[in-house]
Amino acid sequence: MEVGLNEFLDMKKRYEDFKMKNKREPRYVTTKNGYKVMLPVFKDMLRRYEDFVRINGREPNYISIQPQPNGKIEIKKFRDMLRRYEDFVRINGREPNIIYLEQGKSDHVSLGTFKDMLRRYKDFVRINGREPNYISIQPQPSLKGHWTTKVIEKIGTFHDATSLYERVKKTCKYKYYYNDQVPNHVAVMRMTTSGINCTDACQLFSKVLEEMGYEVKIEHVRVKCNDGKWYGHYLLRVGGFELKDGTIWDYVSATKTGRPLGVPCCTAGFQHLGWGIVGPVYDK
């Protein structure tokens, strides 16, 4: 699959505009037909575009999209990738553009992806004193953020938005009160004891999920429950890594009504009201 030069330049402009506006990189860049090019793949396209211009003194007519494989690599295969990478650098005096997953096979990763795998491999060895059993090809959610660390200390470890939801379901409590009333550091203390409401939960867990690398929005809704009444409610819409864009992540579903990830706390009726919290907001 490939895109023409004009389309690529438009993607590049939108990527740069997003970075300037949001002070971070987007999770993906879309083509004109809606295909999502994930950030590592787009950055590899950008590198190849810049290499072509530098070498040829002109822009290419098109840039190919080379989706990288996903999944996990056993440690034995990763060691072989590392050996081939080091051999290439020693022989050629430079790094390779791509590294094949297995010698003689076509599946490969870009240099940037491989170096991220290598970084995560070294981090694991440093922290655990041993090699991992496997290395994930694509970057995994980060667990190093301030609020992520605080939540892990309180409820135990998790590795993505799905396992976080399950930990919340097992360890946290819901308590009804109006709107947001406590800052995030208090919410962390109360979520496993007296409990917190949907608003304070959204403020806290939106921070956690954003630190992990997900796209997160707080949604203001009305839900109709089994008693036939409508209630104002806040939940999260989350996308990235293992979750499809816009997946419902509802603290009250996890802690009170016991529904699975992706389902709102009440299912008899659902109305979208807006985005963000209406009223005072702590910990902006």
Swiss-Prot record:
Activity's dependence on pH: Optimum pH is 6.4.
Q: Which cofactor does it need?
A: Ca(2+); Mg(2+)
| Note accompanying the cofactor annotation | Need a divalent cation like Activated by Ca(2+)>Mn(2+)>Mg(2+).
Provide the family line. Answer: Belongs to the Psimunavirus Pseudomurein endoisopeptidase family.
Q: How does it assemble?
A: Monomer.
Explain the purpose of this protein: Cysteine protease that cleaves the cell wall of its host methanogen under hydrogen limitation of the latter (autolysis). Cleaves the epsilon-Ala-Lys isopeptide bond in the oligopeptides of pseudomurein.
Sorted UniProt keywords: Antimicrobial, Bacteriolytic enzyme, Cytolysis, Host cell lysis by virus, Hydrolase, Protease, Viral release from host cell
**InterPro entries linked:** Peptidase_C71, Pseudomurein-binding_repeat
- GO MF assignments: peptidase activity
Q: Where is this region: Pseudomurein-binding repeat?
A: 4-31, 34-65, 70-100, 106-137
Anything noted about its domains? The N-terminus contains a cell wall binding domain. The endoisopeptidase domain is at the C-terminus.
The name of this protein is Pseudomurein endoisopeptidase PeiW
Disulphide bridges = none
Q: Which species is listed as the source?
A: Methanothermobacter phage psiM100
